[in-house]
Amino acid sequence: MTRKQMELLDFIKTRMDRDGVPPSFDEMKDALDLRSKSGIHRLITALEERGFIRRLAHRARAIEIVKLPEAMERAGFSARAAKAAAAPLPKGAVTVETAGALDLPLMGRIAAGLPIEAINGGPQSVTVPGMMLSGRGQHYALEVKGDSMIAAGINDGDIVVIREQQTADNGDIVVALVADHEATLKRYRRRGGMIALEPANDSYETQVYPEQMVKVQGRLVGLIRSY
């Protein structure tokens, strides 16, 4: 097993253990510092051929860990069949009623111009599937206003579930507070001493700020959409 294969398998199992779903190919590429996703495809194929993982057809982010190298087993990780759930449309969706529903505070809309503290809408709450929550830390919900993240599957009017935290990994979608007065939902990238907040819509430009101007307020862990 090559070093890169080991690194990728370790990253996949760490993210699945933390989030319950595999990372995206973009997240894998960034984690391994590769220039393109083709390298990730080759590593995934090699891991599958060696029997460490299994890809499930016609499902987004559908990777199942089958076994681990002895070195990882000795480190204390128990290989488990952790995989993304599938449903007709959208992929991975579940009904609130079947997922151990919990109430979270709905703090308002995530839109440019207001920090999280200022958009607290009072005692409103929203019911979310318990499986979205990590079991540790505080969570809250926000209503999305705008279309800057549509390519990431986040639409205007969606409810996003956020886990409160002050740090983020490259590629995470976060609530970021800029210059202590503007909150935004964007993909987080560290570039040396700068922080890039990337939209998922070509109509918007990436925002780049000095590190000290950006405070992570939380990380996206789930999304709720009404039809």
From Swiss-Prot:
UniProt DNA-binding region: 25-45
Gene Ontology MF annotations: DNA binding; serine-type endopeptidase activity
Protein name: LexA repressor
Gene Ontology biological process terms from the UniProt entry: DNA repair; DNA replication; negative regulation of DNA-templated transcription; proteolysis; SOS response
Keywords noted in UniProt: Autocatalytic cleavage, DNA damage, DNA repair, DNA replication, DNA-binding, Hydrolase, Repressor, SOS response, Transcription, Transcription regulation
Site (Cleavage): A112, G113
Organism from which the protein derives: Cereibacter sphaeroides (strain ATCC 17029 / ATH 2.4.9)
Family note: Belongs to the peptidase S24 family.
